[in-house]
Amino acid sequence: MVMQIPEFIVPLIPWIRGLVGLSLVGAIFLGAMGAVWIERKLSADIQFRYGPSRVGKFGLLQLVADAIKLFTKEDMRPRNADRLLFDNAPIFMMSSVFLMLVAVPVGAVFINGVEYPLAVTEMDISVLYIEAMSAITIFGIFMIAYGSNNKYSLLGAFRNFARMVGYEVPLGITVVSVAIMTGSLNIVEIASSQGLLWNIFLQPIGFIVFFVALMADMGRLPFDQNESEEELVAGWITEYTGMRFGLAFFAEYIHMILGSFLVALLFLGGWNVPAFVANNAVLGLIAPTGFFLLKTLLVLMTIIGMRWAVPRFRIDQVVDLSWKKLLPLSILNLVWAVCLGLYLGA
Protein backbone atom coordinates (compact mmCIF):
# COMPACT_ATOMS: atom_id res chain seq x y z
CA MET A 1 0.00 0.00 0.00
CA VAL A 2 1.60 3.24 -1.17
CA MET A 3 0.38 6.42 0.51
CA GLN A 4 -0.59 9.26 -1.83
CA ILE A 5 -0.18 12.83 -0.61
CA PRO A 6 -1.51 16.11 -2.08
CA GLU A 7 0.73 17.67 -4.73
CA PHE A 8 1.04 21.01 -2.90
CA ILE A 9 2.70 19.27 0.05
CA VAL A 10 5.49 17.71 -2.04
CA PRO A 11 7.60 20.93 -2.33
CA LEU A 12 7.32 21.39 1.45
CA ILE A 13 8.69 17.94 2.30
CA PRO A 14 12.36 19.08 2.55
CA TRP A 15 11.33 21.83 4.98
CA ILE A 16 9.15 19.46 6.98
CA ARG A 17 11.89 16.87 7.32
CA GLY A 18 14.35 19.62 8.33
CA LEU A 19 11.99 20.78 11.09
CA VAL A 20 11.45 17.21 12.23
CA GLY A 21 15.21 16.63 12.20
CA LEU A 22 15.74 19.81 14.24
CA SER A 23 13.17 18.69 16.80
CA LEU A 24 14.85 15.29 17.02
CA VAL A 25 18.20 17.02 17.59
CA GLY A 26 16.54 18.72 20.55
CA ALA A 27 15.30 15.32 21.67
CA ILE A 28 18.91 14.09 21.72
CA PHE A 29 19.57 16.45 24.64
CA LEU A 30 16.83 14.63 26.52
CA GLY A 31 18.36 11.39 25.28
CA ALA A 32 21.63 12.37 26.95
CA MET A 33 19.78 12.56 30.26
CA GLY A 34 18.28 9.17 29.49
CA ALA A 35 21.77 7.81 28.80
CA VAL A 36 22.82 8.84 32.31
CA TRP A 37 19.88 6.90 33.75
CA ILE A 38 20.61 3.88 31.53
CA GLU A 39 24.25 3.89 32.64
CA ARG A 40 23.26 3.95 36.31
CA LYS A 41 20.71 1.18 35.92
CA LEU A 42 22.91 -0.98 33.70
CA SER A 43 25.94 -0.61 35.96
CA ALA A 44 23.75 -1.49 38.94
CA ASP A 45 22.53 -4.65 37.19
CA ILE A 46 26.09 -5.67 36.32
CA GLN A 47 27.17 -5.15 39.94
CA PHE A 48 24.01 -6.71 41.44
CA ARG A 49 22.78 -3.41 42.88
CA TYR A 50 19.43 -1.64 42.68
CA GLY A 51 20.61 1.63 41.18
CA PRO A 52 18.31 4.70 41.19
CA SER A 53 15.05 3.60 42.80
CA ARG A 54 13.94 6.23 45.31
CA VAL A 55 13.21 9.39 43.28
CA GLY A 56 10.22 8.73 41.05
CA LYS A 57 9.17 5.53 39.30
CA PHE A 58 12.27 3.40 38.56
CA GLY A 59 14.38 6.33 39.72
CA LEU A 60 13.59 8.36 36.58
CA LEU A 61 13.28 11.61 38.53
CA GLN A 62 16.84 11.16 39.77
CA LEU A 63 17.82 13.09 36.61
CA VAL A 64 15.74 16.05 37.78
CA ALA A 65 17.34 15.84 41.21
CA ASP A 66 20.80 15.86 39.63
CA ALA A 67 19.90 18.90 37.51
CA ILE A 68 18.67 20.78 40.59
CA LYS A 69 21.87 19.83 42.42
CA LEU A 70 24.07 21.19 39.61
CA PHE A 71 22.06 24.41 39.33
CA THR A 72 22.26 25.10 43.06
CA LYS A 73 25.92 24.18 43.61
CA GLU A 74 28.34 26.99 44.31
CA ASP A 75 30.12 28.20 41.19
CA MET A 76 33.79 28.14 42.17
CA ARG A 77 36.81 29.32 40.22
CA PRO A 78 40.47 28.67 41.16
CA ARG A 79 42.31 31.76 42.36
CA ASN A 80 44.92 31.76 39.58
CA ALA A 81 42.70 30.45 36.80
CA ASP A 82 42.52 32.09 33.39
CA ARG A 83 38.99 33.45 33.66
CA LEU A 84 38.33 33.74 29.91
CA LEU A 85 39.30 30.15 29.18
CA PHE A 86 37.88 28.70 32.39
CA ASP A 87 34.44 30.25 31.90
CA ASN A 88 34.03 29.62 28.17
CA ALA A 89 35.66 26.23 27.60
CA PRO A 90 32.55 24.17 28.56
CA ILE A 91 30.47 26.31 26.18
CA PHE A 92 33.03 25.65 23.43
CA MET A 93 32.78 21.90 24.04
CA MET A 94 29.00 21.95 23.94
CA SER A 95 29.06 24.06 20.76
CA SER A 96 31.37 21.62 18.96
CA VAL A 97 29.08 18.72 19.88
CA PHE A 98 26.04 20.66 18.68
CA LEU A 99 27.78 21.40 15.36
CA MET A 100 28.21 17.66 14.93
CA LEU A 101 24.52 17.10 15.59
CA VAL A 102 23.29 19.18 12.66
CA ALA A 103 24.95 16.86 10.11
CA VAL A 104 23.94 13.53 11.66
CA PRO A 105 20.62 12.10 10.40
CA VAL A 106 18.48 10.66 13.16
CA GLY A 107 16.24 8.51 11.00
CA ALA A 108 14.20 8.61 7.81
CA VAL A 109 10.63 8.38 6.57
CA PHE A 110 9.37 6.81 3.36
CA ILE A 111 6.57 8.64 1.52
CA ASN A 112 5.29 7.17 -1.74
CA GLY A 113 8.28 4.83 -1.56
CA VAL A 114 10.71 7.77 -1.58
CA GLU A 115 13.26 8.08 1.24
CA TYR A 116 13.45 11.37 3.17
CA PRO A 117 16.23 11.44 5.79
CA LEU A 118 15.54 13.33 9.01
CA ALA A 119 18.49 15.68 9.25
CA VAL A 120 18.87 19.39 9.90
CA THR A 121 21.19 19.64 6.90
CA GLU A 122 22.61 17.24 4.34
CA MET A 123 26.20 17.70 3.18
CA ASP A 124 28.13 15.98 0.41
CA ILE A 125 31.12 15.72 2.75
CA SER A 126 29.18 15.16 5.97
CA VAL A 127 31.50 12.33 7.10
CA LEU A 128 34.55 14.61 6.93
CA TYR A 129 32.60 17.40 8.63
CA ILE A 130 31.59 15.15 11.53
CA GLU A 131 35.16 13.88 11.91
CA ALA A 132 36.48 17.46 11.98
CA MET A 133 33.94 18.62 14.57
CA SER A 134 34.71 15.59 16.71
CA ALA A 135 38.44 16.31 16.57
CA ILE A 136 38.15 19.93 17.72
CA THR A 137 36.73 18.87 21.08
CA ILE A 138 40.35 18.37 22.15
CA PHE A 139 40.76 22.16 22.02
CA GLY A 140 37.93 22.51 24.54
CA ILE A 141 39.66 20.04 26.84
CA PHE A 142 42.94 21.95 26.57
CA MET A 143 41.11 25.22 27.25
CA ILE A 144 39.65 23.67 30.41
CA ALA A 145 43.01 22.24 31.52
CA TYR A 146 45.09 25.35 30.84
CA GLY A 147 42.44 27.70 32.19
CA SER A 148 42.17 25.71 35.44
CA ASN A 149 45.87 26.24 36.28
CA ASN A 150 45.93 22.77 37.82
CA LYS A 151 48.61 20.12 37.29
CA TYR A 152 46.13 17.24 37.32
CA SER A 153 43.97 18.95 34.71
CA LEU A 154 46.97 19.58 32.47
CA LEU A 155 48.25 16.01 32.78
CA GLY A 156 44.78 14.76 31.89
CA ALA A 157 44.69 17.00 28.81
CA PHE A 158 48.10 15.73 27.67
CA ARG A 159 46.90 12.16 28.03
CA ASN A 160 43.78 13.01 26.07
CA PHE A 161 45.86 14.54 23.29
CA ALA A 162 48.18 11.50 23.10
CA ARG A 163 45.20 9.18 22.92
CA MET A 164 43.25 11.17 20.33
CA VAL A 165 46.24 11.63 18.01
CA GLY A 166 46.78 7.88 18.01
CA TYR A 167 43.17 6.85 17.51
CA GLU A 168 42.00 9.50 15.04
CA VAL A 169 44.27 7.91 12.40
CA PRO A 170 42.74 4.39 12.35
CA LEU A 171 39.30 5.93 12.89
CA GLY A 172 39.72 8.12 9.80
CA ILE A 173 41.15 5.29 7.68
CA THR A 174 38.19 3.08 8.58
CA VAL A 175 35.72 5.81 7.62
CA VAL A 176 37.54 6.21 4.28
CA SER A 177 37.23 2.43 3.77
CA VAL A 178 33.46 2.68 4.20
CA ALA A 179 33.31 5.69 1.86
CA ILE A 180 35.25 3.76 -0.81
CA MET A 181 32.64 1.00 -0.72
CA THR A 182 29.87 3.56 -1.22
CA GLY A 183 31.65 6.00 -3.52
CA SER A 184 30.45 8.92 -1.40
CA LEU A 185 31.35 10.96 1.67
CA ASN A 186 27.69 11.74 2.33
CA ILE A 187 26.64 9.84 5.43
CA VAL A 188 23.03 9.64 4.21
CA GLU A 189 24.15 7.93 1.00
CA ILE A 190 26.44 5.61 2.96
CA ALA A 191 23.53 4.53 5.18
CA SER A 192 21.06 4.18 2.29
CA SER A 193 23.42 2.26 0.00
CA GLN A 194 23.86 -0.62 2.46
CA GLY A 195 20.37 -1.97 2.00
CA LEU A 196 20.00 -5.17 3.96
CA LEU A 197 23.68 -6.14 3.40
CA TRP A 198 25.28 -4.13 6.20
CA ASN A 199 28.89 -3.01 6.18
CA ILE A 200 29.55 -4.97 9.36
CA PHE A 201 29.31 -8.14 7.24
CA LEU A 202 31.46 -6.75 4.42
CA GLN A 203 34.08 -5.16 6.70
CA PRO A 204 34.08 -6.97 10.06
CA ILE A 205 37.68 -5.93 10.79
CA GLY A 206 36.79 -2.33 9.94
CA PHE A 207 33.86 -2.47 12.36
CA ILE A 208 36.05 -3.70 15.21
CA VAL A 209 38.70 -1.05 14.53
CA PHE A 210 36.09 1.69 14.24
CA PHE A 211 34.30 0.70 17.43
CA VAL A 212 37.48 0.47 19.52
CA ALA A 213 38.85 3.75 18.09
CA LEU A 214 35.49 5.42 18.70
CA MET A 215 35.53 4.28 22.34
CA ALA A 216 38.98 5.82 22.70
CA ASP A 217 37.89 9.00 20.93
CA MET A 218 35.01 9.41 23.37
CA GLY A 219 37.28 8.73 26.35
CA ARG A 220 35.11 5.94 27.72
CA LEU A 221 36.50 3.16 29.87
CA PRO A 222 38.87 1.43 29.31
CA PHE A 223 40.20 4.58 27.58
CA ASP A 224 39.52 7.26 30.22
CA GLN A 225 43.15 7.80 31.24
CA ASN A 226 42.57 11.56 30.99
CA GLU A 227 40.40 11.48 34.12
CA SER A 228 41.49 8.36 35.98
CA GLU A 229 40.44 9.05 39.56
CA GLU A 230 43.19 6.96 41.17
CA GLU A 231 45.95 9.01 39.54
CA LEU A 232 44.60 12.44 38.53
CA VAL A 233 41.69 13.10 40.93
CA ALA A 234 39.25 13.92 38.09
CA GLY A 235 41.77 14.79 35.38
CA TRP A 236 41.00 17.65 33.03
CA ILE A 237 37.75 18.52 34.81
CA THR A 238 39.09 18.53 38.39
CA GLU A 239 38.43 22.22 39.13
CA TYR A 240 34.87 22.41 37.77
CA THR A 241 31.68 22.51 39.80
CA GLY A 242 28.03 23.33 39.24
CA MET A 243 26.70 23.95 35.76
CA ARG A 244 30.14 24.37 34.21
CA PHE A 245 30.82 20.78 35.22
CA GLY A 246 27.32 19.90 34.03
CA LEU A 247 27.96 21.31 30.53
CA ALA A 248 31.20 19.36 30.10
CA PHE A 249 29.57 16.22 31.52
CA PHE A 250 26.54 16.66 29.26
CA ALA A 251 28.75 17.16 26.18
CA GLU A 252 30.44 13.83 26.93
CA TYR A 253 27.14 11.96 26.95
CA ILE A 254 25.86 13.66 23.79
CA HIS A 255 29.16 12.70 22.14
CA MET A 256 28.49 9.11 23.22
CA ILE A 257 25.03 9.17 21.62
CA LEU A 258 26.50 10.64 18.43
CA GLY A 259 29.08 7.86 18.37
CA SER A 260 26.27 5.31 18.64
CA PHE A 261 24.51 7.01 15.72
CA LEU A 262 27.68 6.78 13.62
CA VAL A 263 28.11 3.06 14.30
CA ALA A 264 24.49 2.42 13.28
CA LEU A 265 24.80 4.60 10.15
CA LEU A 266 28.17 3.39 8.88
CA PHE A 267 28.06 -0.31 9.76
CA LEU A 268 24.57 -1.42 10.83
CA GLY A 269 22.53 -0.39 7.81
CA GLY A 270 21.08 2.83 9.22
CA TRP A 271 17.32 2.97 8.73
CA ASN A 272 17.10 0.48 5.84
CA VAL A 273 14.02 -1.74 5.95
CA PRO A 274 12.51 -4.25 3.49
CA ALA A 275 10.64 -2.75 0.51
CA PHE A 276 7.21 -3.89 1.71
CA VAL A 277 7.75 -1.93 4.95
CA ALA A 278 8.99 1.19 3.15
CA ASN A 279 5.96 1.18 0.83
CA ASN A 280 3.45 0.75 3.63
CA ALA A 281 1.44 3.88 4.45
CA VAL A 282 2.00 3.67 8.21
CA LEU A 283 5.11 1.55 8.62
CA GLY A 284 7.03 3.68 6.12
CA LEU A 285 6.68 6.64 8.49
CA ILE A 286 7.51 4.84 11.72
CA ALA A 287 9.53 1.66 11.16
CA PRO A 288 12.72 3.07 9.55
CA THR A 289 13.38 5.61 12.31
CA GLY A 290 12.29 3.18 15.02
CA PHE A 291 14.58 0.47 13.66
CA PHE A 292 17.47 2.92 13.47
CA LEU A 293 16.95 4.18 17.03
CA LEU A 294 16.78 0.59 18.29
CA LYS A 295 20.19 -0.14 16.75
CA THR A 296 21.53 3.07 18.27
CA LEU A 297 20.22 2.07 21.71
CA LEU A 298 21.88 -1.36 21.49
CA VAL A 299 25.22 0.24 20.54
CA LEU A 300 24.83 2.76 23.37
CA MET A 301 24.17 0.03 25.91
CA THR A 302 27.23 -1.88 24.65
CA ILE A 303 29.41 1.22 25.11
CA ILE A 304 28.02 1.75 28.61
CA GLY A 305 28.42 -1.91 29.54
CA MET A 306 32.08 -1.89 28.47
CA ARG A 307 32.79 0.62 31.23
CA TRP A 308 31.84 -1.88 33.89
CA ALA A 309 33.22 -5.00 32.23
CA VAL A 310 36.74 -4.01 31.13
CA PRO A 311 39.45 -2.57 33.42
CA ARG A 312 41.23 0.66 32.56
CA PHE A 313 44.38 0.34 30.43
CA ARG A 314 47.63 2.10 31.20
CA ILE A 315 48.41 5.05 28.94
CA ASP A 316 51.36 3.19 27.34
CA GLN A 317 49.09 0.22 26.58
CA VAL A 318 46.57 2.57 24.99
CA VAL A 319 49.19 4.13 22.72
CA ASP A 320 50.63 0.72 21.78
CA LEU A 321 47.16 -0.60 20.93
CA SER A 322 46.61 2.28 18.51
CA TRP A 323 49.92 2.39 16.64
CA LYS A 324 50.90 -1.30 16.75
CA LYS A 325 47.55 -3.03 16.31
CA LEU A 326 44.67 -0.82 15.17
CA LEU A 327 46.67 1.14 12.58
CA PRO A 328 47.93 -1.97 10.71
CA LEU A 329 44.44 -3.50 10.90
CA SER A 330 42.85 -0.32 9.52
CA ILE A 331 45.30 -0.29 6.59
CA LEU A 332 44.56 -3.97 5.94
CA ASN A 333 40.85 -3.17 5.99
CA LEU A 334 41.43 -0.28 3.56
CA VAL A 335 43.13 -2.63 1.08
CA TRP A 336 40.25 -5.09 1.50
CA ALA A 337 37.70 -2.31 0.90
CA VAL A 338 39.46 -1.22 -2.30
CA CYS A 339 39.57 -4.78 -3.63
CA LEU A 340 35.95 -5.42 -2.64
CA GLY A 341 34.87 -2.10 -4.14
CA LEU A 342 36.54 -2.95 -7.45
CA TYR A 343 34.95 -6.39 -7.42
CA LEU A 344 31.48 -5.01 -6.72
CA GLY A 345 31.96 -2.13 -9.16
CA ALA A 346 31.73 0.66 -6.59
What are these regions (language model features)?
Residues 2-346:
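Selective transmembrane helix interface/packing segments
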